Curated annotation (Swiss-Prot):
This is Cytochrome b-c1 complex subunit Rieske-2, mitochondrial. It comes from Arabidopsis thaliana. The keyword Transmembrane helix applies. Residues 1-62 form a transit peptide. Disulfide bonds join 222-238. It catalyses: a quinol + 2 Fe(III)-[cytochrome c](out) = a quinone + 2 Fe(II)-[cytochrome c](out) + 2 H(+)(out). Belongs to the Rieske iron-sulfur protein family. SUPFAM superfamilies: ISP domain, ISP transmembrane anchor. Its cofactor is [2Fe-2S] cluster.
Amino acid sequence: MLRVAGRRLFSVSQRSSTATSFVLSRDHTLSDGGNSSSASRSVPSADLSSFNSYHRSVIRGFASQVITQGNEIGFGSEVPATVEAVKTPNSKIVYDDHNHERYPPGDPSKRAFAYFVLSGGRFVYASVLRLLVLKLIVSMSASKDVLALASLEVDLGSIEPGTTVTVKWRGKPVFIRRRTEDDIKLANSVDVGSLRDPQEDSVRVKNPEWLIVVGVCTHLGCIPLPNAGDYGGWFCPCHGSHYDISGRIRKGPAPYNLEVPTYSFLEENKLLIG
């Protein structure tokens, strides 16, 4: 548009100079022809008026042409110029691609390689994630050393009748008592209904001769003393809880009987705790 305006202005200046030279030459010719002074003055004034009208018409034509040119590219319409340029492209519209870097389209033959790389990366990622999950699960499971410590094998051949042996299992003391016939009769003669934590003696033992209980008081976790108390079983010196020969609470603040751990007899004189 600026180029068009420059051309119009240049053409107007040329026309103006041509008209001016024409009027001056006309005036000079008339004055040299020997006519009167009034005639020589009237001719240039008429020529000047015609020149002014011609000059105004040229300017009006230039303005109308500029407006028409503006309307052609969409400045005079309600639609924005950019939208109009997109709808009606022409050779006069030039786009500046300096700030818009254009990349050439990709080669279709390389798509297979790109898909292969992406798929392979996903499989590798899934494999690594699977290994991490498996390692986490394995680390959370107990090892063989821990499982070995979780169970304890005890030889019962050296325990005399009427005595109690204390072993350590999972950081806790375990009482193993070999009961006599009198101890068994005394444990079965108790009225279960009168107990704070009622349990039959047959429920607490697998072999009536052997009683296996965890040596921790159910009150506050103290270790009771064997072969002590008012009932011939265990006595807790911390707060005065009394347990009978079956490990049941008979007196004192303890709310429950002594805990019976999981155990089994491997052989006649072999005991496995845990």
